[in-house]
Amino acid sequence: MTGEPSLCIRGCGFFSTSQTKNLCSKCYNDFLKDESARYLATFNVNTKAAEEVTAQEATVLGSKGGCACKKKVGLLGFHCRCGHLFFASHRYPEEHSCPSDYKSAAIDVLAKQNPVVKGDKLFRL
């Protein structure tokens, strides 16, 4: 402990400690309430944003039946590049009438990942 007690930094006239950020007990409790209110306000904003995103996903996906057969997929569904859901019997693009061109996309990816490397020709003597 230090020799001389310090007063509250908010000027209320009560004594404070360094453990309570140089605030008296009343001011420190008020400070904690304000901090928790700020935290809850940011938490509520984040949850509202997350709820909006899930609501948008729900409207896009509907009843989780992303194909023409209207079968409910549940947790077994996968998202296709076109945005539809498909499962084991629809795992081929032709089965769920996917407009995405997988072959040309795969060829482009392979061309970028594996560039053609040619060395200089050596002249024979």
From Swiss-Prot:
Question: Could you state a single Gene Ontology molecular function term?
Answer: DNA binding
Pfam families recorded? zf-A20, zf-AN1
Zinc finger (A20-type) stretch:
2-36
Query: Which superkingdom?
Result: Eukaryota
Q: Where are the zinc fingers (AN1-type)?
A: 61-106
Q: What keywords sit in the KW lines?
A: Metal-binding, Zinc, Zinc-finger
Q: Does the keyword Cell inner membrane apply?
A: no
Xref: SMART domains: ZnF_A20 (SM00259), ZnF_AN1 (SM00154)
Q: Write out the residues that bind Zn(2+) 2.
A: 80, 82, 96, 98
Q: What does this protein do?
A: May be involved in environmental stress response.
Protein name as it appears in the record: Putative zinc finger A20 and AN1 domain-containing stress-associated protein 8
Q: Which organism is it from?
A: Arabidopsis thaliana
